């Protein structure tokens, strides 16, 4: 079975929807629970972090509120310091072997990266306009390079 899930729910103003998240977490009882990047839309990340802890999340997947996590290294540092050992801050979005050095000064425990590359779609569905002209696939070379870069941190 599954050992973990990634969940998220926001209110119209961007705050975490505590009621919905509580209900989802109850359904995921016994699993490792990660708060997804809806966290990046919250107007007060410090308060949202405390809410995530109170709700029982074990980690927060976040770009630090930026399009790419490496562009928000200082925000991530602040979140990691606030979190301490209570919850893991897992940077994600724009993580690659080339961008990892921007986060090297952080006490990271985990990162999230797609390690993907664009691949053209050549089937009839795409040709007829029923799908995107390309898809993203995991690139083994990028995965290996990221693992090597992480080992050097």
Enumerate the predicted regions with their spans.
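Short charge-dense sequence patches
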Residues: 1-4, 24-31, 52-55, 97-100
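Catalytic cores of alpha/beta
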Residues: 19, 40-55, 78-91, 95-113
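Catalytic beta/alpha-barrel core
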Residues: 3-17, 32-43, 49-50, 58-70, ...
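Hydrophobic/basic alpha-helical segments enriched in Actinobacteria
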Residues: 29, 50, 54, 65-66, ...
